Amino acid sequence: MIYIRVEDKSEGRRSVPQSHKLKELRKEGDRAIITILADDLYSFVGSCEGRIIAGESQAPLNDDDLCRAASDYDRSGLVENHNILAFVVIDPDTGRIRIFRNFSGIRPVYFHQGDGVFIYASHVGLLRNDVGGLEIDDSAVPEQLVYRFLMPPRTIFRGISSLPSGWALDSDPLTGMEPSLVSRWSLGERRAGGRVADALEEVERILRRTTAEIKKTAVPVTLLLSGGLDSSILGAVCRAEDVPVESLSSGFHKVTGDDGESLYALSAAENLGFQHRVYDLSGIDYLFSLVDSILEAEEPIHHLQSGILGALFRNGLGAQSRYVINGQAADVVFGGGVFPILWRTRHIIRLLGTFWGRAIARPILLPFSRRDARVAFLLSDYSPSLDRENHFFWSLEAWGDIGWVRTHFGVGLSAVINGRRSFLEKFGSWDFMDKTALMLFSGDTDATMRIWNKLGEACGRIVLFPYSNPELVSYLFTLDWGTKAETPKLLLAGLARRLGLPSDIATRPKRSFGFPAKFWALPGGLFQPLVDMAAGDFDPMELQSLQTMESSKAMTLWGLLNLYLAKQMLVRQISPDDIKKEIVSRRATAQAN
């Protein structure tokens, strides 16, 4: 946790957030006052050649590390030490502040600039007084409800922005200069298709080196092992590097009656030779964790799984377990998920991106789209122009009901997609596949890692995501798409075999880490107390219309309930204990009736 404020010395020093967890450092230059509040988990503060060096790192740093990173940043605008997640350089005399956010993301960089003052913080709560109190930005709500997150630099709070991963910020607040945001993403030269074995060797080398660094911490490490391919590979890498780990998974058997997730995880743990535990939640456990997780993440928590992981971090880890390894980001960096179908249909997509292609092919494909989802997929617009309503980028990862959101809020499509469009316009020269990968990594993947990292941080844990290692991301983002996406999971399955995992694990399908909508979305389901409570903020009939098994409407309900809880705790500052008491009371009343 870190808070840095640069302000004009002539204006006098303003009050700073108060917390017993944070140590305060204050420095005065010729024109500026710099105030830094930092804790001991991620934060670092030092100096080099008269400049203040600060930020957040997932591993300890010494003075030489800081000066080396400052030299890298001066030379290239990048920081080569991949453990540094946020890097800040401040000139104490002029007040100029420069920030780089690691390509891997993970730690948020929130910022606000006012008259003669600039503030960077890892937590929006630290900015509360600087922005005159936290308020929901109503214009951001449509995008939030459809996609479950916001594309940076936008946040759900008015007056607070967020630096995208792999971007740099430069501000000189004492001169009134607006913050300048610049992307450091560069594909460089595309690696031509080579032997898959060469790619596997390089990927294994990077992952093993990343894991070996964890071993240096000499503290207990926990691996979140779902039993799927992504987490099993990380387990195999830990085994190969002799990193002692305990594996852990979550279950929702008490609610769903389905123990498949636990059996999946246990079979992988047995093969890896790990001691494995399953943390099982009840319905009330989940509801309480949902409340706590939104408070800790300081935003809607995107995935239903986030509530499960929050409970696992709080109650399922050993007291000495400081580091937690998570397999998030594998799909997007290895070309899984949507990419194999995009690659296999690339020639059709290229044709449909032209005027004549749309004019000729669309009428032919339309009758088949009602029976075949793959054909419907192709009917999206794939043209270079981002002005079309049915563009593929607007439907990708659109979990909520766009039609409902537009009607309910009385807005056009631009209110939903402007964040995505503004982000994509910065990368106009990029190939369609590369744009898709970067949007997913900088949006959905980054939001997920940021939220899960903050849930771990709230319990004193550092959550590591080896698949988001910048060296690995750089290598795989520049690897040709034919090697990555021609065959689904080709690289991951090959990596699993190289690491000695049996074929049944190397080829097993992904299982959901969450729980089906029938347990929470329908009237009388798990979320009914929250639906009743949210009726004070939203039309009860509208909420009831979303209590259905129709996926997009159920996800819109999930988004509204997240938004309601975020507003209650973060804006109105109602305590989580009071919210939990009301949940218990409403459940008891419902059961009595």
Can you say where each PLM-predicted feature lies in the sequence?
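Cysteine-centered catalytic environments shared across enzyme families
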Residues: M1-E298, L309, S585-A590
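Acidic, carboxylate-rich catalytic segments that either coordinate divalent cations
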Residues: I2, M533-N593
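Short amphipathic alpha-helical segments and their helix-coil junctions
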Residues: D65, D72, N129-V131, G419-D431, ...
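Structural motif
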Residues: S76-L78, V131-S139, D198, K426-L440, ...
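ATP-dependent adenylate-handling active sites, centered on carboxylate activation for C-N bond formation
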Residues: T94-R98, P108-V109, D115, P173, ...
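Short, hydrophobic/amphipathic alpha-helical patches that form generic packing surfaces
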Residues: P142-L150, L438-R450, T478, M555-Q573
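Active-site-adjacent bridging/hinge elements
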Residues: L181, L281-L290, T445-R450, A534-Q544
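PAPS-dependent sulfotransferase catalytic core
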Residues: V338-F339, G500-W558
